[in-house]
Amino acid sequence: MRRSIESVIESWATKDASRPLLIRGARRVGKTYAAEEIGRRIAGDAFIKLDFQTDLELIAPLFDCPTDDVDTIVARISDYKRTPIRKETAFILFDEVQLCERALNSLRFFSGSGWRICATGSQLGVATRKRKLPFPSGVRQETMHPMSFEEFLWALDEGQMADAVRTHAGTLETYAAHQAALSLFHR
């Protein structure tokens, strides 16, 4: 399933990963799916995922060190995953990072470190009100929304219709497949 955010993640990962990428959005909109898809495609076996939702008790201690010591954090992640992690190839995903305040805080120290760190978070606004540490600066933030009509058309393999709807949306021209598009919209 193709999502618009994927091009943002891919561009960040291949051209400008100097700052960690934090993908915000409501629960269950596909943040993890999109980040994993791109991470696995770009990094292959060097893709590392830390899932704070399911493994919080195991992962949180990895951040029980100064949060500005990113090399120690990565070394601990490497030990936890039992795999070497190389800066040049790794794509590290912190999934549902808001559940671990120290992990969320560490993001700002990964900025400029050379590590490619992507994080996802839902309910970040709620989580940040309860925080003892400041919200991380130096992090690129993107918001992911529920599936758009264009993404819905892509999922149905209706790419040509998606392009035509986008083209005609800003004009007063009639669209030959308007009824078909409307029918899909109401589906």
Model-derived regions: residue spans:
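Pre-Walker A adenine-sensing motif
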Residues: 1-16
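Conserved lysine of the Walker
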Residues: 31
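Interdomain motor-coupling "hinge/lid" segment immediately C-terminal to the ATP-binding subdomain
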Residues: 128-187
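Conserved P-loop NTPase "ATPase switch" module shared by AAA+ and STAND
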Residues: 84-103
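Sensor-1/coupling segment of RecA-like P-loop NTPase cores
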Residues: 111-132
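Hydrophobic positions on the alpha1 helix immediately C-terminal to the Walker A/P-loop
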Residues: 34, 38
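Short glycine-rich substrate-engagement loop in P-loop NTPases that contacts/grips substrate
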Residues: 54-87
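Hydrophobic anchor at the beta1->P-loop junction of P-loop NTPases
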Residues: 23
